[in-house]
Amino acid sequence: MNLKEMLLDKKEMSKIMTKIENGDEDLSSEILKHIKDARIIGVTGVPGSGKSTLIAKLSSRLLEINHKVGILGIDPSSPFSGGAVLGDRVRMKELNKYENVFIRSISTRGKIGGLSYYTTDFVNVLDAAGYDTIFIETVGTGQDEVDVFNIAHTILVLQVPTLGDEVQVIKAGQLEIGDIYVVNKADQGPADEKIKELNLILKKRENGWQPKVIKSIAVRSIGIDEIIQSIDEHWQFVKSSGLLEKKINLRIKYLLKQHAMEKLDRIMESEVIDSYADEIIKGKNMREIVKEIITKVGVEYGKGGNV
């Protein structure tokens, strides 16, 4: 079975993802030759804002009109076991009846903040497999919002009328990255006030896009059609404004950075770092030790070692 055939089989596609996650960079490079033009949508917001429910409702509607949808849910992981804490996306059970959907939870494997090192690789696999719409659900930690900006074409930021105020939004950095703002759970608080606040604060982007603000009650499918319409409008804007090429370039740069950072983190988490810590305590120069660590990563990687 060749790579193209494997990408058409969900079980084989899962195996491809696992191989890449286990360090198969040749496979990661090969996948890049097959990526197409999937639209990538990052969904972020504080825990409890209804991200999983919203993605499930959006996906259901898209699947009903013959889209092929991939969903990557970033789960916080145990810093001890490295395993996902949340496991499968229990709120997405309604999608089980559809054939053209692929859902995978990704453990951050103890990485503090941000996305998994292999999120971009998994997006590339789904893209190469012909999934035309790919959702990335973030944990909502702050750093992952910055990370998802490097991958997604469109970013949905969820707000809840009962959680926080505009000052907290600014602290989270969400005002700078969002393309569409969804005030979800609109029946649980002063949603109209939150919408007014956002419309006053949000400014037109340098690229010419004016962020949208939409009211939603995702659990009751209220606002879903309007959100999809805004996603479609932003996708057309991305393609017509020249932003698509910039986003693809940003995605590849981020992919390279994440692979390099993962190698460095493996060294930092290994027993080797203990000896370096002892040397620091004994008075060895910090600059020399950092140079040694970087050299070690380069040497081991050049040997094809498991760094």
Residue ranges: model-predicted function:
Residues 2-49, 58-144, 151-157, 165:
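Nucleotide-state-sensitive switch-loop elements of NTP-binding domains
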Residues 3-8, 14, 32, 43, ...:
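Expand to "…catalyze enediolate/carbanion chemistry for C-C bond making/breaking, isomerization
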Residues 13-15, 215, 226-302:
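Long, well-ordered amphipathic alpha-helical subdomains in the mid-to-C-terminal portions
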Residues 52:
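Walker A/P-loop
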Residues 85, 122, 147, 151, ...:
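Alpha-helical scaffold elements adjacent to nucleotide-binding pockets in ATP/GTP-utilizing enzyme cores
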Residues 150-168, 179, 183-192:
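Conserved Switch II/interswitch segment of TRAFAC-class P-loop GTPases
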Residues 180, 186-240:
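Canonical P-loop GTPase G-domain recognition
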